[in-house]
């Protein structure tokens, strides 16, 4: 399990620095199943989780929602039958902050 899971998201300001390009590979190694994607020129973290039923997918989505409230950092979530797509990025800075990697690692830890 990644050390990121043990960390807490910090309050993010509009002038907070984005994750630097040279930091990205090391952070991605800690969440190996997450894919960096770019949409609307914004770098984000994305992962699809698969489940055997809609109710399992909803249960997982609710766990993410609870964690997101506790961390005060919220993802985009697409819920479908047997599938939950989670995308993390920091709106205030229009890109990736360390909080996104912490939240991605915590999301992985909820999928038990």
Describe the function of each predicted region.
Residues 1-34, 38-112:
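Long, contiguous binding/interaction regions
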